[in-house]
Amino acid sequence: NLKKEDVIILPIINFIAASNLASMLQAKIYYADVCPNTGQMTPETLKACVKKNKLKNIKAVVVMYLGGNPDNIKNFYYLKKKYKFYLLEDACHALGSKYIYNGKIYNVGCCIHSDICVFSLHPLKTITSGEGGIVATNNLDIFNRLIKLKNSGIDKKDYKKKTNFPHWLYDIKYPGLNYRLSDINCSLGYSQLKKINKFISKRKKIA
């Protein structure tokens, strides 16, 4: 629900997609520096960005797992609670990755320590559907909004409670677009899930 003049912080090394979207929504975009060893934003560079620009009301922070390495998520989680921002994981490189928090292993995408996690299904990523992506969240409000936005804002929920309602009957409660993958794309992506462990092992060897 990013609005005009809302503050969003991104790592300076990232794909242009997140910046494009924030710019289209007329948000205020700030870029945090990255660690020279990992290429990733760190809690320290995030705090430095906040201090340098005297930011107070931060709406969202995007962390990007360059090379599939979910670095520092637990420390970003502490900052999320402190500054009350939405934490988004750009896990386009990290499908199948895991991280350790308080001695427990978590899958990237579980969204226990973030609000939203996104994966890419581009041909260069871990698995592909030709194009497209995946959004994960544990936030029910965000989930319901995503469901409405993905299909041109169409909402059939109220009518599904009734019996024998016409299939063409629906409401438009939000402006939305068509974010649905075709059946062919979905079939390709689903078939690649069977190979994901093999793909990850090969990438580890190369790394």
PLM regions: where:
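Conserved donor-binding loops in enzymes that form glycosidic bonds
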Residues: 12, 66, 193
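Aromatic/hydrophobic pocket-lining residues that form π-stacking "cages" and hydrophobic walls in ligand
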Residues: 18, 76, 146
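Generic beta-sheet signal
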Residues: 11, 32, 88-90, 120, ...
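Active-site region of PLP-dependent enzymes
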Residues: 93-106, 113-207
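Hydrophobic/aromatic ligand-binding patch that stacks against planar heteroaromatic rings
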Residues: 20-22, 79, 184
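Active-site phosphate-binding strand-loop segment of PLP-dependent enzymes
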Residues: 37-129, 134-142
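Conserved PLP-anchoring active-site segment centered on the Schiff-base-forming lysine
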Residues: 1-56
